[in-house]
Amino acid sequence: MAPPFLGRKTSYENDGQLAPEARLQSANTPGLKMVNLSSTPACELDRFIKDHLPADTSFHAELRADIDFICAFLKERCFQGAAHPVRVSRVVMGEHTMLKGRSEANLVVFLNDLPSFEDQLNLQGEFIEEIRKRLCQLQQEKTLQVKLEVQSSEQPSSKSLSFKLSSPQLQQEVEFDVQPAYDVLFALRNNHKPDPQIYTKTYAYLISVCTTLKKEGEFSTCFMELRQNFLKHREPKLKSLIRLVKHWYQLCKEKLGKPLPPQYALELLTVYAWESGSRDCEFNTAQGFRTVLELVTKYQWLRIYWTLYYDFRNKKVSDYLHKQLKKTRPVILDPADPTRNVAGSNPLCWRLLAKEAASWLQCPCFRTCDMSLVHSWEVLTKVEFPQECVLL
């Protein structure tokens, strides 16, 4: 039996017909003060976000430290004596706008010595089981500042793995979806100004594999670092608006109790709304929030993409992008992975969310002090492609 990992010595101690009731409360966080978002005046939304949405700073600091610890632990312990000579190269947490109470995040375990996307696909089950085993060891050793709970799998051969880090005292928890990934960007990590052609070749290779295997979007986790960078350096107030939209999304999820579009699609929609309609560092939050909800109601026209990491200059990539953008809408391409439409493929999900968004547009949170409705930003809903940056 391996000795306890000694990377760090700490221990875990113990509105009438308006929008429906929208309260900041969760079954997992019963002590949170109940606050009605729908009846919060537009002029007080910034205060609402500041007081009620960001994760507790103490928990956030402990969480970051524990993620670093888990990364070091997995790098030391994983795949010792395994049949496949892979090693953990790094662990990346994909979350920059965490909410108070309960949040969800991806934890991508990048593997070096893994030669291809196909190997990731074929060996995913083995990798998941190895990581699960090591996390269970860490859970028993209790060396983290917050509480670690590895979720049990319903199926022995499951290719999914999740664990929870929580602080009962702070009433805060984050559930992580763990995904092993081929480190396709390994050569670019330490290069501050990589040759754009390297990205082009990487995406051409990705497109070739995904179309051949009919696995579009399957390898998006391999580009998690680029997805992180897309949001990491955004304006603080834009991140606050993303938190507000995520909170609204969670309220809709609790009320409707049915599958909704992926949350990440709403985050990207928020970025698009700001880039297209404002770009002001000190924008009006109610206007931004209203713009996002109006875009949700127009989901059948959404066609959005960015050309930050991939573009139309390479013929193979260009041909593929044109095919993607001509598909049934909504289309919201992952800025880090052109094969992944983050809008999903279920129009019923969008129809449900659009109906809920429409019911919110008359709420007090969109009214000024004289009770007039705030105006949304002017955002184009139909632009021909290709263009330099973003299309709707």
Regions found by a protein language model. Give the residues of each.
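Short amphipathic alpha-helical segments embedded in low-complexity Lys/Glu-rich regions
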Residues: 85-95, 144-161, 260-267, 286-290, ...
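Amphipathic alpha-helical protein-protein interaction segments
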Residues: 52, 56-64, 98-100, 116-124, ...
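Conserved nucleotidyltransferase catalytic core and NTase-mimicking acidic/glycine-rich helix/loop elements
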Residues: 230, 236-355, 359
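Conserved catalytic core of two-metal-ion nucleotidyltransferases
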Residues: 74-85, 101, 124-212
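C-terminal helix/juxtamembrane-tail motif
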Residues: 345-392
